[in-house]
């Protein structure tokens, strides 16, 4: 019954804060050559840290990435960070949507003011919805572990391969970045078994996330 199934559902944030949410955005009119000549990502992080410490721009973090796009003079960004949100609560999620967009335009002003090559940059698009990293955690017939990923585990009931790094996005104090990365050794990919998609206590459902 449903009661049995619910025993195997946990919610992110019950014990430790849930991972942070992110609104991505795209910008045009970026002089990539000038940005790289000024120091690129290392320079960007230095400028972000200076802005946070000086209080000149309301940025939520001291690190971020601005990879280039196929379109000329355009960049995509991963810099917004909205913390302490239960994304299963519609009021909190709505507030996070608003905050994510506010932060995006704060970054636009920062990039124009402080980053060489971005003086004329402008936002040309925002993600249609804020990116939610975790909410409910459904326990499957098998639970993939960190050790499985790092040891490049193999399973007879493998249904897909994954080579992406393990990411854990947390909010630090005063803009410090507490994101933890763990890359799969040797650029390999580990198996994800079918049993991870089958919730404990049910036989008519698949879940993924």
Kindly label every feature range from the protein language model.
Residues 2-208:
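Flavin (FAD/FMN)-binding glycine-rich loop and adjacent Rossmann-like elements that form
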